[in-house]
Amino acid sequence: EKGWGVFGVELFVLTDGSVLFNEVSPRPHDTGMVTMASQRLSEFALHARAILGLPITQEHVALSIPDGAVAASHAIVIQGDGEAEFRNVANALSQPGTDLRIFAKPEVHGHRRMAVALAIGTDEADARAKAENVAESLEIDIA
């Protein structure tokens, strides 16, 4: 069948170099949220344009970060049972070039990805370090 829009493909690269397939989802995947920091239109906006039959040009997929800059994301996975409360957000986002997307998931039971930290850096290591710093600076309570 023919499909329109974004298909998220999740693969795992093991330490021995082998690749394992995990899933294909006919929608944007949260691991692609880095596009909200790096591109003019995110994967979510591009998905909407595709399924609505709207044109997608080079202008739509253009990067929105300075030449040579790199974007990175860091998933925030919470373990527990109850509602998650995010605190210390302003401090976590005090470094320029950082952002945080908290998902509208009402509660966590076990392990659940609840947010993603986004960052722009001068290189991959810088962007990753900034995103990790945002995640580590958050205070998360489970009630």
Show where each model-derived region lies.
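Active-site "cap" helix and flanking loop/linker of ATP-utilizing ligase/carboxylase catalytic domains
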Residues: 1-9, 15, 25-82
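Short acidic-glycine loop/turn motifs at beta-strand connectors
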Residues: 14-17, 121-123
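Peripheral (often C-terminal) accessory segments that flank ATP-dependent C-N-forming ligase machineries
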Residues: 49-143
